């Protein structure tokens, strides 16, 4: 799957970054939480993109995998009504949208989700991680951004992203 992210073809075209957390729940078993960050000036229709990613996952797993698309109009309205909308198109000049998007991203890395930790680690010669991320690389273009000083948002360095998406501590029993 990570190779598909890197290739940036099809539903991954204009992908800027991603976060992928592997978990093991008591009712769902093994599952993953995936957050994809696209260039919003190039891609839109988040519901459609999420469905395309789910179809790609079903293809990879030969029909054994499934996905849940939280980017439906109804689901996003529920989040918006509670002031929690952090998925879909995020506008950098909207502080609440930015904060909510960061809250969504931080959900992937919460080490306190103790009941969903990986109980059985995949076998390999070296320890396997349960969180993966793709990092946006600077492209050299300068954009003029007119944000109010009170917006509390701005350009993040790679270190800022690393600090936010720091890999969770893996607890082994």
What are these regions (language model features)?
Residues 1-15, 22-24:
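Short N-terminal edge-element motif at the start of the domain
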Residues 12-14, 25-29, 47, 51:
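Alpha-helix initiation and capping sites
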Residues 17-41:
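Histidine-centered divalent-metal-coordination microenvironment in nucleic-acid enzymes
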Residues 40-42, 47-173:
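Catalytic "initiation/cleavage/transfer" segments centered on a nucleophilic residue
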